[in-house]
Curated annotation (Swiss-Prot):
Name of the protein in its database record: Protein transport protein SSS1
Principal subcellular localisation of the protein: endoplasmic reticulum
Residue spans, topological domain Cytoplasmic: 1-46
GO molecular function, one term: structural molecule activity
PROSITE patterns tied to this protein: SECE_SEC61G (PS01067)
UniProt similarity note: Belongs to the SecE/SEC61-gamma family.
Extracellular side: 76-80
Length: 80
């Protein structure tokens, strides 16, 4: 009798593990669909602000990279 109850508990534990494995992707999909439902496209004003910010960032990174290159060219020739 004790053996039958042990097998029943093992089966319950394995069912719980399977439920936990299945629950994670289902929860992920549910939360993802809720997030996408809340999202909206930016209006023209917001879009232009984003484009300006990204453009300024590209220009700033380019200027910094160019300045670093200008500094390292003479240093490279002094070392070599």
């Amino acid at each position: 009798m004790a053996r039958a109850s042990e097998k029943g508990e093992e089966k319950k534990q394995s069912n719980n593990q399977v439920e936990k494995l299945v629950e994670a992707p289902v929860e992920f999909v549910r939360e993802g669909t809720q997030f996408l439902a809340k999202c909206k496209k930016p209006d023209l004003k917001e879009y232009t602000k984003i484009v300006k910010a990204v453009g300024i960032g590209f220009i700033a990174v380019g200027i910094i990279g160019y300045a670093i290159k200008l500094i390292h060219i003479p240093i490279r020739y002094v070392i070599v």
